[in-house]
Amino acid sequence: MVRWQLHGRSGYVPHERIFRDVYLLHRPEQCIEDYFITTDIHGSTAGVAVRLRYYDSAVATRITLYDAAGTIVGSVTPVEAPDDAAFPYHAEITIVDPTLWNAEQPYLYTLVLDTPCETITDRVGIREVHVANNQIYVNGQSIKFHGVNRHESDPVTGYAVGFEQTKKDLLMIKKHNFNAIRTSHYPDVPYFYQLCDQYGFFVIDEADNESHGASEYYCEGNESWPNHVENWNKPIADNPEFTEATVDRTRLCVERDKNRPCVIIWSMGNESAYGCTFEEALAWTKSFDPRRLTHYESAQYRSKNRKYDFSNIDMFSNMYPSLESIQEYLDNEPDKPYIMCEYSHCMGNGPGDLEDYFQFIQSHDGLVGGFLWEWCDHGIYKGKMPDGRGIYYYGGDHNEWPHDGNFCMDGLVYPDRRPHTGLLEFKNVYRPARVVKYDRESGMLTLHNYMDFVDLTEYAALTYQVSCDGEVIDNGFIPYPDGFTLPPHSENALPLAVHIPDKGKCFLKIFYHCDKDLSLRSEGHLLGFDEILLENEDSRNQKTLAMWSDAPSNSTITVQETDRHLTLCGKNFTYNFNKLTGLFAAMQYEDAVLLDKEMEFNIWRAPTDNDRKLKLDWLAARYDHCMTNAYRTEYQVTDSGVTLRAKVGIAPISLQKFLDLDVCWTVSNSGAVTLALHAERNTVFPELPRFGLRLFLPKEMARVSYFGMGPMESYCDKHHAASHGYFSSTIWQQHEDYIRPQENGSHYDCDYVQLDGAGIKLTAVGAKPFCFNASHYTQEELTEKEHNYELHPCDSTVLCLDYAQNGIGSASCGPRLAEQYRLDDASFDFSIRLIPEKA
């Protein structure tokens, strides 16, 4: 065995030794050495051309094409083609009314090459691909890539990924509505492509060219990005000494995979800059295979010293672009379509911008889609925790160098292929169809089909569900009317009459189910759903309204005051209020302790991986070490209870105050506690991680029920896999166990949440929808620990009631969080009510 390279890094944990199958194949002395299958479509016919090359001399060969049912379509004998030095024998079979191959309908013919001493069988997909009008067309249809980057990686076997492992990945990828894969950053095992042919994926096949790490050593002491770009290509990409090596790697990729219909784009490599070596690789590729498209993102990284040839590149590619930068490109009259070879970095809790990218992709023809980074976390399995969860190491945990820490934990699935919530988010964002509108008066439901090739009626069955204040009040099957069609990229309306109550928060959900057993997705498989808020006379949650009403009470509250505290005593409760912080230090209801420690105004969250740049600003502002001080506190006893008012400031240790709060607490005679505050923020400080209340409840309060977006975690920019409803679970089930601990488990757009246990219940209800998080881990613990197996639960149930959280985004390796998701309000109001009850 000859080692291919001495050193190499492609963005994930390095391994050694042989990791691909090595085999010896005994063949006849005279046989077919190689063949190249191409297809052409001519109206209602198609041609399947086979070019052959023999070892030594030609042998008698019969080429037969079968359809998927096993019927012979055509059979021919190759003839000599002396003008073709590479493949000097040709054959062609013409098919009338062919069934074409695409990612949604991966129809395959079988080609058999018979010689006296052996038989070779291959599968053929008839398809064409070309660029026109800055769009990519397959079989004459403009397509969008809903793609993902995929490394070959397994937590136990490393790079050695077998057939069943590959099949499992592709099964999951297909079930979550992807239609394309980029083989980052090298050609995959051969059976990967055969499975992609069969299951239906468009593939960008990438040659094993990468010099990202090496480029860092040639910046001549200037680490600025412009200097990096200017000098990146000098040592390798624009150095003629590397031309043969670069072309050789490209040639090996192209020649091996040339017969796979799933491959529609050849990629020259990754992050290697541009120069003469890649000009030659592209020219060779286009000469050898002009029917496919070419891609190379690093073409934009070159020096200004000379003109470069980009004529053999079919698209402009970029990584992690902002929507603004894409718009700038499209506004500049480009001559190539725009493709995002990597976007929406999926590291940890994220990504949070998938819906925004989807809307932009669909509304701009020149943007042909993209490929998420990336499929899986590259953790190394190291055994199990006592509770059975896996222990996974990442960069540096083996004391190796160099490494990128947990930057290899950047996938949509955990190392063992459990889905991240980001994968569920993608699945529903890229559902096959969407509701355009629902007209209550006419009872007509308008749908848009986002498929590229298939009529929705041939693919998806529809069901519906109507809920009111969290209770399902109607559901059923939606039949397609006679003659109804919904072709790709079109809209149509069908009838759906539902009963909508006059009062209550009502939602209509439309579910899309796989109509038959298609491409790994069994009949009934949920493809996605829509949720529509239904208008009625009073769309407020009626249960929430009732929680804001106090039951009549003849009891009163007495107040005892000291220099530091106010003690409020009611019929069945005692609350201790800290005059120095403007917060309750202790709460006891029906002889049950509600607070293990003083509640807090809370602005910190355990930084997500997507906060890794922003957290530097947060730490500089010392948001993780803040003090709360009340400057003036007063109270008033009324017939209905007690009102407490305080002027409160929040400041980091040794820095100036950045939040001024006008706080009003109202305690009713029944023991309900209502907070209403107005906040003014010093906008010199960075956006807030969050703002809200943090309560430390007894750990026995270990069950949570809520009306909001669930059941999985949800955030202001990451909630499309969730839906509104009433949900109930344990506190442990709320935790999303990311390999590197971080903020997780929040729920967005909630009306109320209730925790109970040990004979006591506490309900929090918002004047407006709020966010909450309930956990046995503190945000400090999640911030401090580097691995999930290092986490220790606290002795309380931690309940965070948030006015809002900063969005999630994908800034771990992408643009800054979009402005509309930043918690940077100059002022805001927040009101929430706490209602204790005996269980």
Spans of features found by a protein language model:
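Extended substrate-binding grooves/exosites of carbohydrate-active enzymes
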Residues: L6, R27, I120-T446, Y450-E458, ...
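Beta-strand-rich binding/interaction modules
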Residues: T45-E80, M444-P479, L494, G504-C514
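Intrinsically disordered, low-complexity Pro/Gly/Ser/Thr-rich segments with frequent PxxP/GP/PP motifs
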Residues: P78-V96, G470-K503
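An acidic-aromatic loop/edge-strand motif
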Residues: M1-A46, V50, Y54-S57, L111, ...
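Glycine/proline-rich low-complexity spacer/linker segments in large multi-domain proteins
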Residues: M1-H26, A103-V112, F511-E535, F691, ...
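Beta-strand/loop-rich accessory regions of lumenal/periplasmic or secreted enzymes
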Residues: N102, A497-G504, I532-A839
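Surface beta-strand/loop "capping" patches
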Residues: E29-D56, H420-A460, M547-D563, L677
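Short glycine/proline/serine/threonine-rich loop/turn segments at secondary-structure transition edges
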Residues: I95-L108, P501-F507
